[in-house]
Amino acid sequence: MENARIKAIAVSKETGNLSLADDSGLSVEALGGAPGIYSSRYASSDKERIEKLLAELKPFSNRKAKFECALCIASGEEVLIEVSGFCEGLITFSPKGENGFGYDPIFEVSGLGETFAEMDYEKKKQIGHRGNAFKFLRPELKKLFA
């Protein structure tokens, strides 16, 4: 949540407007939560990030993982809303699917047997971490602007 908060406050202060910031990441249980907040900087490209993560997971049987999304709305220095959402799953042994980006080809959603990259956008939006975070944001926005 801290990164979303930092981003939202910085943009709101710079623009003088309300700001919504997102910070998302993939946490892998066997790797102590890595790549976590460093998900986008874990390697230099999506392909290299996937290869690195799969290589680091080779010695582990535990492939549990979770995508998390933190959303923050700020006005100047004031944080107005903070919510988060997540989606649990497993890291596959090899990439599957053509849709999405980032770690989507190796993140298999718990109970569904398919990766984010095998899903269409609408399905991913409904069950994914960002979609879940925005589901929590909606009622908070209604309260804020009531």
Q: For the regions a protein language model found, what residue spans apply to each?
A:
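Anionic-ligand binding patches
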Residues: 1-146
